[in-house]
């Protein structure tokens, strides 16, 4: 019985301390965007902004090493990559439209597209194996490899 009374008294004390007069929480502003679009170095920047407005997914050709390796629970240091040439992003976007974007409705993409799509000219693991497309460790990133002017030379079968 004494333990119960002690617990009740302790609970009342914590409750009384929690009800102090403090200033209200101020206005919390909106958070800035993670990436600034357009990135400014590609003729395809307008198309990339349109995709972001439609799908809320960043298509990035300019990013930093921490952007590339970041994961929610671990980092992804197992890839070596080379950035894509910004001038060939129109070719890359045409390719992505043909094999991905045109296959589903805009509503589907808006709901299920990864948060960011990082485009690389070359990407391979530290073991030397190539990954043509892979999800990042954070579950929000998608990496697309082998993006260059060569994409426009692919046939429909390839």
Question: What residue ranges belong to the model's regions?
Answer:
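Glycine-rich, often proline-containing surface loops adjacent to acidic residues and nearby aromatics
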Residues: 73-79, 138-146
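Hydrophobic helical h-region of N-terminal Sec-dependent signal peptides
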Residues: 9-13
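C-terminal motif of bacterial Sec signal peptides marking the signal peptidase cleavage site
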Residues: 15-18
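Active-site recognition of the HExxH zinc-binding catalytic motif
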Residues: 144-158
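Acidic/polar, low-complexity intrinsically disordered N-terminal segments immediately downstream
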Residues: 20-107
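Auxiliary, metal-adjacent structural segments of Zn-dependent hydrolase domains
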Residues: 86-140
